[in-house]
């Protein structure tokens, strides 16, 4: 019998008497082959997948926290597995996803345009609605133009990876969001990490940069994992001192 989570000092130490059998079963599901045919004659990737059963063990223990299906509106209270529970993880701070006006507009847009775009925005997936939205946002924030993305992760992935070149620099906080880190990895620029919210560390990294090269400082506004706020006044001060540009991911 599977031991309860509270009895295990660490998740990876859960005692599963049938652990090996479970792993074999999971491996056979991944490989779409009968358990009887399961053997060691697997390629390295399949073998690696077969050995990784932590998610299945977490599900069996009832502590797997991901991909829980919600069967209700996105409100402060939602229904999961038939139970009404409080939602503390929502990004919908305004509640607009359930605003009757937004719902009606979405219905009308579906009637006119269909249920989705038939291509990427770069080719044939840009609708007049997208351009109208970009124009209204640009007017609202007082900028010449804006570019909208479908996700916040996509913004940082797309922008951070393309703004700078091979001989330029990206300076980033060690607690930056994963999307910033992935965008930095895709860039060909030189990457310099500074200690979390440590302005002395940031300045030392700025001093390492060649003066005539582009320097992009990328930081969260509110750090999503810790909840603390970036020292933007000091970051801007240093950016002016070393002729750098600041990019802020203001997601929260």
Question: Where does each model-flagged region fall?
Answer:
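Positively charged N-terminal leader segments that act as targeting/secretion signals
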Residues: 4-12
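N-terminal "arm"/small-domain region of PLP-dependent enzymes with the aminotransferase-like
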Residues: 38, 43, 47-115, 244
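Conserved N-terminal alpha-helix of the aminotransferase class I/II PLP-enzyme fold
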Residues: 104, 108-152
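Conserved PLP-anchoring active-site segment centered on the Schiff-base-forming lysine
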Residues: 159-178
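Short, structured coil segments at secondary-structure junctions
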Residues: 166, 186-188, 242
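Active-site phosphate-binding strand-loop segment of PLP-dependent enzymes
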Residues: 192, 196-248
């Amino acid at each position: 019998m599977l031991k309860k989570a509270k009895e295990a000092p660490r998740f990876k130490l859960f005692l599963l008497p049938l652990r090996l059998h479970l792993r074999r079963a999971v491996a056979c599901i991944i490989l779409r082959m009968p358990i009887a045919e399961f053997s060691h004659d697997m390629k390295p990737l399949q073998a690696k997948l077969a050995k990784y059963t932590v998610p299945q063990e977490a599900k069996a223990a009832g502590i797997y926290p991901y991909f829980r299906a919600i069967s209700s509106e996105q409100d402060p209270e939602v229904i999961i597995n038939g139970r009404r529970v409080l939602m503390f993880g929502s990004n919908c701070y305004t509640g607009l996803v359930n605003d009757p006006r937004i719902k009606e507009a979405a219905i009308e847009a579906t009637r006119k345009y269909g249920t989705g775009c038939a291509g990427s925005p770069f080719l044939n997936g840009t609708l007049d609605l997208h351009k109208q939205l970009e124009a209204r946002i640009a007017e609202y924030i007082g900028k010449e133009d804006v570019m909208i993305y479908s996700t916040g992760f996509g913004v940082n992935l797309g922008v951070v990876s393309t703004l700078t070149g091979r001989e330029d620099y990206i300076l980033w906080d060690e607690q930056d969001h994963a999307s910033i880190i992935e965008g930095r990895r895709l860039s060909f620029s030189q990457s310099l990490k500074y200690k979390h919210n440590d302005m002395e560390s940031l300045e030392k990294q700025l001093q390492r940069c060649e003066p005539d090269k582009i320097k992009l400082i990328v930081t969260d506004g509110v750090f999503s994992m810790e909840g603390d706020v970036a020292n933007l006044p000091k970051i801007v001060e240093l950016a002016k001192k070393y002729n750098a540009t600041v990019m802020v991911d203001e997601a929260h």
